[in-house]
Amino acid sequence: MTTFHFPSIFVPLVGLVFPAIAIASLFLHVQKNKIV
């Protein structure tokens, strides 16, 4: 676990992807409920 540094790339990726999915799903949910 000393030379294997995949978490250093994985942590920001997950940190960016998770909020993006959350915001996208929330946005789609609002768009589906409010048909303007």
From Swiss-Prot:
Q: Which SUPFAM superfamilies match?
A: Subunit VIII of photosystem I reaction centre, PsaI (SSF81540)
Q: Write down the membrane topology.
A: Single-pass membrane protein
Instruction: Report the transmembrane regions from the record.
Output: 8-28
Q: Which InterPro entries match?
A: PSI_PsaI, PSI_PsaI_sf
Q: Highest taxon of the source?
A: Eukaryota
Entry keyword set:
Chloroplast, Membrane, Photosynthesis, Photosystem I, Plastid, Thylakoid, Transmembrane, Transmembrane helix
Provide the Gene Ontology terms for cellular component. chloroplast thylakoid membrane; photosystem I
Instruction: Give an example GO biological process.
Output: photosynthesis
Q: Where in the cell is it found?
A: Plastid, Chloroplast thylakoid membrane
Decide whether keyword Electron transport is in the record.
no
Q: What does this protein do?
A: May help in the organization of the PsaL subunit.
Concerning its family, UniProt says: Belongs to the PsaI family.
- Name this polypeptide is given: Photosystem I reaction center subunit VIII
Give the originating organism.
Jasminum nudiflorum (Winter jasmine)
